[in-house]
């Protein structure tokens, strides 16, 4: 590790977002110099030694075709104070384990040597593949909840977290969705350069936090599971009949299965219990109505299947992290006021 400036390494690959990689690089590289220049016209010097590395150090194109010229290969880096595994996008229906496994040995060795290990978005999957999140909580994009449950059950995904400090000495830190790299950058700056430097950087780059977390942005995964035809038929039915009374019993009857067998197979196919799946669909539909209409909340609750508006509000807050009225104010596409809260 460097004696003068903390060494920060950004690990990127072909599925990394340019916004994450270059956003992190620009913000971290600016620490110690840009704020002084902007506010005092005084020269400064970079406080952090920031480098981009890849699996082989060769020039490549990241997600979207943007060229990346790494400073080095990951194996050229034997020591660093902190490394960031940038997002490495994977379709939720795929299995990225082979792609991620090439980084595992280096990540484990870096952690064993004392480096802080952090990730952004799907970068947490890379850490999980290396076994570094076993027995720990983690943040990642909300859409990867089922993938974590299926491929990495030893890790616990906190779907609403923006930053998750997952090791008691804070040497493993994971960040949620793609733009949560901003929170991670400020955390890194505060950790290595102090709170004042982090605040100065936030002012220069106009960075602010995701105060609502991820839940308001989360959407239900509607993918039909083709491997279980019975459950697929039930998914197709509930997609059109989510507001029906007693929908779980209706799906059970449609399946022709005993209740416990149906619940077990539904959970296995979708990653959710039948009632959780129904509630997620109903709240997703309610979100779209709040975004696009001025209908009163009471009317929306009834339209998606809740006759008790209070129960609807409780469920909405549980799944979305906010109230229907606050969600409408933040996300309404029409800019119209609600006719009842």
List the model feature ranges, each with a label.
Residues 288, 292, 303, 310-341:
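…primarily DNA-binding HTH/wHTH and HhH modules…
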Residues 165-204:
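Conserved anion/nucleotide-ligand pocket segment
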Residues 103-143:
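Catalytic nucleophile loop
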Residues 220-246, 252-255, 276-295:
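A short, Lys/Arg-enriched amphipathic alpha-helix from helix-turn-helix/homeodomain DNA-binding modules
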Residues 192-236, 244:
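Accessory alpha-helical/coil subdomains and C-terminal extensions
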Residues 239-240, 245-281, 301-323:
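Basic/polar phosphate-binding segments, predominantly the helix-turn-helix DNA-binding elements
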Residues 49-117:
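Flexible gly/pro-rich beta->alpha loop and the following alpha-helix that scaffold active-site loops
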Residues 2-78:
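N-terminal beta1-alpha1 cap of cysteine-dependent amidohydrolase-like domains
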């Amino acid at each position: 590790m460097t004696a003068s400036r903390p060494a920060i390494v950004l690990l990127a690959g072909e599925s990394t977002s340019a916004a994450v990689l270059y956003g992190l690089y620009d913000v971290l590289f600016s620490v110690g110099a840009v704020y002084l220049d902007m506010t005092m016209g005084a020269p400064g010097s970079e406080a952090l030694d920031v480098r981009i590395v890849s699996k082989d150090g060769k020039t490549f194109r990241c997600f979207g075709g943007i060229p990346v010229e790494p400073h080095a290969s990951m194996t050229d880096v034997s020591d660093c104070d902190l490394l960031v595994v940038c997002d490495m996008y994977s379709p939720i229906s795929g299995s990225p384990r082979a792609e991620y496994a090439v980084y595992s040995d280096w990540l484990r060795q870096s952690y064993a040597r004392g480096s802080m290990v952090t990730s952004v978005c799907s970068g947490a999957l890379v850490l999980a593949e290396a076994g570094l999140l076993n027995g720990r909580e983690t943040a990642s994009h909300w859409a990867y909840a089922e993938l974590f449950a299926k491929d990495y059950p030893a890790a616990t995904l906190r779907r609403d977290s923006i930053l998750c400090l997952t090791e008691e000495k804070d040497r493993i830190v994971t960040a949620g969705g793609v733009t949560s790299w901003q929170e991670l950058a400020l955390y890194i700056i505060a950790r290595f350069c102090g709170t004042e430097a982090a605040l100065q950087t936030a002012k220069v780059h106009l960075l602010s936090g995701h105060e609502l977390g991820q839940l308001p942005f989360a959407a239900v995964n509607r993918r039909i599971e083709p491997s279980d035809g019975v459950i697929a038929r039930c998914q197709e039915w509930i997609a059109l009949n989510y507001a029906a009374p007693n929908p779980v019993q209706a799906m059970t009857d449609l399946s022709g299965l005993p209740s416990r067998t149906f619940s077990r197979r539904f959970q296995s196919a979708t990653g959710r219990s039948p009632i959780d799946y129904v509630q997620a669909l109903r709240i997703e539909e309610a979100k779209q109505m709040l975004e696009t209409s001025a209908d009163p909340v009471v009317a929306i609750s009834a339209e998606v299947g809740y006759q008790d508006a209070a129960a609807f509000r409780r469920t909405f807050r549980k799944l979305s992290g906010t109230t229907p009225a606050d969600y409408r104010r933040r996300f309404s596409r029409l800019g119209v006021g609600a006719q009842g809260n």
